[in-house]
Amino acid sequence: MITPADPAARTGRGLVSSDLRRRSAFGGALIAAFGGFASFNLLLSALPAYAVRSGAGPSGAGALTATLMASTLAVQPFTPWLFARLGRRNSLALSGALLGLPSLALPAASTLTALNGLAAVRGLGFGIFVVAGVTFTTELFPAAGRGRAIGWYGAAVGVAGVLGAPLGIALARQEAYTLTFALAAGTAGLVVAGSFGFPRGTGPARPAGPRAARSWTVRGAWRSLRPMTGPLLVEIASTTAYGVVFTFVPLTASAAPQALLAAQASSVLARLVAGWLIDGYGGRRVLVPAVLVTALGTAAGSASDEPALLLAGAVLFGAGFGAVQSATLVLVMQAADEGSAGLGRAGVAWNIAFDAGTGIGSLAGGPLLSAGGPSALFPTTAAALAALLLVPSTRRPRHSDEGK
């Protein structure tokens, strides 16, 4: 008979308790991922038209997204410090508040300056949110199971896009901006709700790995980031295409709501399948075909007057982009030192790459669209993405599980 004093009983209960905490935290992370990205996608697809209505041209609409991304990038290097001071629950809740509250002020903003100011505040929240999501999720699972965990996290992100992006366009075309902004604030509230799945305190969600974290020096940072360079470059290029597609397809194609819905839907399935393939075969074997499919789908954005071709391209873009996100994130995490500090640093680097690419695409795409139209913008973006495969890859991660 096992009594409560039996060490085996205490150990078993500890394992059950730890598993319940992990499930609770992962569930909270998925709720937060859905809410945060639903809010993000609603406004990403609606605000360009709102900015144009306020007197800005395509370049002004692109600059609005670029402001959001610039603010996001500015806060991300400080997120490990923030997580250590506030803890996971409070950090995630803060990100939801910063992401959602400015949305309520958007109906009163009618100038590009005011819109950029609110976008900057939202960018602070988004920057904290995206680093928290991928870092906290990764910390919950050992390296061998991260592909599927990241796949599920990415699926939640994709479902948010399936609902958020087309709905934002549809509401903008009805000029139902007040409803759009209220929905963006409400879905951001789910980030705050999801934060309660995490325990109080500042400790990592799982014990630190066997490697001790390097001190944060310029030399140490470069050494830790150097093995990640290849996946990070691919991430920047792929999200540049993402910024172009999701900012400018709504301005160039009448079938934009259907196209973005198709892209987001295919991305959900691709993230789940890619997670399984990555755990089985390694991220590098998934990455190359995923990049090529993304480039092909991006080029199809030039078919603004051919709905069938545009929709087919959108399906390809979503499938390729979803797989690229899962593969690059897993590869970056594999290149990091195990432990909370190393994984946190990798999470920051990957998210900076994501947001930098999105900002580059939305900012540079406006002048290119004005100069050459869709036939110049989308194929040029696709060619730049595909050309990156010609760049020699960096050395393999020190503790990669490739080639299983």
Where are these regions (language model features)?
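C-terminal membrane-cytosol helix-exit motif in multi-pass small-molecule transporters
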Residues: 186-208, 391-395
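Helix-breaking motifs and short loop linkers at transmembrane-helix boundaries and internal kinks
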Residues: 87, 108-113, 282, 304-305
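Cytoplasmic helix-loop-helix junction between adjacent transmembrane helices
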Residues: 120-157
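Intracellular juxtamembrane helix-capping segments at the cytosolic ends
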Residues: 128-141, 323-338
